[in-house]
Amino acid sequence: MDPAAPAARMTSSFTINISTPSFYNPPKKFAPVVPPKPKVNPFRAAEEPVPQENSAGPGLRRAFVGKVGQIPSMAPPGGDPEDFVLPPPPPNEEPMSPPGSSFPPPPPSFGDDGPGSPLGLFPPPPPPEFSEPFPPPIEESFPSPPPLEEAAGLSDTQDPPASVPPPPPPLPSPPEPAPPVLCEAPKPAPVLPKPPPPSAFPKPEPPQSVAPKAQSSIFIPKPSPPSAVAPKPVAPPPVAAKPSGPGPFVGPSAAPPTHTPAPPAPAHTFSPKPVAGPTFAPKSASHTFMAKPSAPVFSPKAATEPPTEAPQERFPASQSSPKLTPAAKHEAPPPAAKHEAPPPASATRAPGFSFAQQRDKPRVLEKPRANVRDLVPEPPVETRGERTLGPQAEGGRSFGAQPIGGKDTKPLPEGLRNQTPDGTHRVGGQPGTHRPTPHQDQTSGSQGLNMKEVEELEMLTQQLMQEMDKPTPAAEAHTMELCGFCGRGLSRTETVVRAGEHLYHVTCFTCSKCEQQLQGQQYYESAGKPLCEECYQDTLECCAVCEKKITERLLRAIGQAYHPSCFTCAVCKCSLQGEPFIVDDNKLPHCVSDYHRRYAPRCTVCGDPIAPEPGRDETVRVVALEKNFHMMCYKCEDCGCPLSIEADDGGCFPLDGHVLCKKCHTVRARAALG
């Protein structure tokens, strides 16, 4: 092969590896599938005849499906049988490689659903809502498209599919089945034209002949170092041969396709599958199938097949053409592996299980509830936009779960959300009919309480309810109220009396004087003790004025109790509540003005009572010679000059009972002496 070729394409006889999903609990093996008779393709007449010349671009190498013992007539110059390396078939995948393709090589399908049939692009329908699979004639009438070589080269690295997709229908006039052309010893290499640049879409390539084969093998040309195709690991397990009926047939691919089907990549639309021990069983051609969770499904379609819009809507087109990382290029198998003959189909199928049986029961899919540790994704081998081959068991068929092809690259939360509590798993939003298995019963305990724990919880609840119904005496005494008088507990069944902030027995709540029961009667509290109305009246004080009981507001003054209305001035009878008052010698209250008018000393000069000045409570008076004077009336009797209250020259100089100033005093004294 030309080492400068950016990508290598190959086509081979269509081998369908029918295998059960990896989450089947018991391993199942099935008998060989009886190849059905070829059917007439209704779309054949409207398409162009199968061209016999290679329309692929230069540099693209391809292999063709031929008749028994017939070598392809067209072979590219420089074709060497040594360039074609037939990697061992995978233990759990059925590669599909129709010859022609109208789009660039898609990436290897990790976790592919199986044969590249037109149904491979459809998302899994909800089996619980449909009692029968979809009508097979609709999908079986489509001619098998030329699969991509990456699908065949990488299909062996994916886990067993979780569904049973139908094989593609045969073409109108298939020749007799025969072993594949390139399964023999080194023969003339099939025509492998060089591909155009990776960014361009290579032209479809016509097949040499349309020949369904009973037992065919998948072979991949040896990838060159720059090739983007990931070869298979060394010594993978054998792959069961496919019946000639459902084998892929090369449809007319001379003309470019009228549409560009994007290879579906439901890696981000389906939840990861549990890494449980897988078993392998033949796949059914039924229309009820479930897509693998984390790998694009490459379903071969004829180049002239009408476009199908439903698969493109269900599957994201962002991953339709992922690329292979260089890590996958270094795992090329030795050239000797290309001539290994696949074992018979009975090696991987249980006896007694035929292809027709799966068609009758297409939706009987068992999927155990995945353990949480099984759902933890392995270290991802897939990057955004690029895919690499994951580890795979070497040397013999491995029935244990292996993280291959980016199967478990889906995060755990989405996988857990797609798993319903009743054991039904949902893939891509569609429920799958899965019956619980013993493995599910074992793992269900980690998600909820088992029966023993539920019974224990119910028993504890019943015990708690009984304890609440029958409280202990200590708890009862602690929660009960106590009587305010006797201090004993108050039963919930007897009548109690609430007075203020305390509760009392009926017999205890009585008048503190006459011991009359006060239940239902008006009572008064005096010094913290209840009193009846009569006894309460006896404790009341009488007014000092009217001598009546003071039942309301009480005004206490001069050591006596008064009604506020009875405490008035003895002269003017004005209320003294809140006003200053003066009590006379008879203990009668007087207002200040009346008291001074009645009892205040009078001025010797003017004769008026000496009362406090307005706005003042104090009375200012001058006493001289045992006489009372107003401050303004304290003057010299002779000259009338004001006198000072101080003992100085301006003060009073009395003479013969007269209040005189110093000057007048001198005059009168001299006159008396003279």
From Swiss-Prot:
Q: What does this protein do?
A: Adhesion plaque protein. May be a component of a signal transduction pathway that mediates adhesion-stimulated changes in gene expression. Suppresses the transcription-repressing activity of hesx1/anf1.
> Its gene?
zyx
SUBUNIT field: Interacts (via LIM2 domain) with hesx1/anf1.
GO cellular component, as recorded: cytoplasm; focal adhesion; stress fiber
Q: Known CDD domains for this protein?
A: LIM1_Zyxin, LIM3_Zyxin
- Stored PANTHER family: ZYXIN, ZYXIN/TRIP6
Entry's localization field: Cytoplasm; Cytoplasm, Cytoskeleton; Cell junction, Focal adhesion
PROSITE patterns annotated for this entry?
LIM_DOMAIN_1, LIM_DOMAIN_2
Superkingdom assignment: Eukaryota
Name all LIM zinc-binding domain ranges: 481-542, 543-600, 601-671
In this chain, the stretch annotated as Disordered covers 35-447
Annotated protein name in UniProt? Zyxin
